[in-house]
Amino acid sequence: MRFLLLLPLLLATALPAAEPLNLSAALRQPGLSVVITGGTPLVVTVTNQSATPVTIAQPAGLICAGGDSRVVTLRALEVNVAAHAAAEATVPAAFLRDGEPTKPWLPTAETEPRLAPLLGYLASHNDMPRLTAQLLVRCVVTDIDFAAWQRSLGVEPPAEPTPEHIVAAIDALGVLRELAPEKTFALATDPRLKLLALRNPVARRKAMQLYGIDLPEAPLPPELGTLLHTKPGDNCPICRQRALMQPREDGL
């Protein structure tokens, strides 16, 4: 009798853990509901109505479709869902193709081999800003230039790119030089980006290195704003000029 009581416990410990499911398999699994929403990032919501815990594991590089639009996941995803429970996870993603997406997204069997080196790089660089990572995907897949990328972000002339966009573009250019030094990307030959980056105090030093401009031995010239007064009585060029223009008490 004691053996019969212990038998369920022994069988439970002997049974191997359920294999993780990828998102496509999870969508077909009875008792599971998987909904993929969001954009960049994607939001994966899993509802487990079964009596068995479930693990969903998806490597980076999954391409999801929403109408004519496509997004690709930039990092691996793992979701552990207890029995009769729900869980939600977000995964960084980037658009492969512009367009008005339909929701929810659906995983596809499509692949993009050109992204393999970039995905490997991102796996070891967890601090990569989202904007930079998304631009890198567009550069690798479509060789997008700076102006086209700005249009995809809704920045149309005469609007100027934000400093954040300029820094992201220069950071992306640095990564591209590291991943594919033999290739010339459209981003690297964009004269407007070069001019904007050299004028940007945050991106200037890195831009000079990327564009092959010798760095001066002395510190870079200070910005004009640092030369102006910040409080009354500061000896700035404007204050000195104003003092020279004031009439003297002796009338001279």
Q: Which sequence ranges carry the predicted segments?
A:
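Asparagine-centered strand-capping/turn motif at beta-strand->loop junctions
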Residues: 36, 40, 44-56
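Acidic (Asp/Glu-rich), glycine- and aromatic
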Residues: 31, 52-71
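Terminal connector regions
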Residues: 94-149, 154
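A mature extracytoplasmic/lumenal domain signature
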Residues: 50, 58-62, 93-95, 153
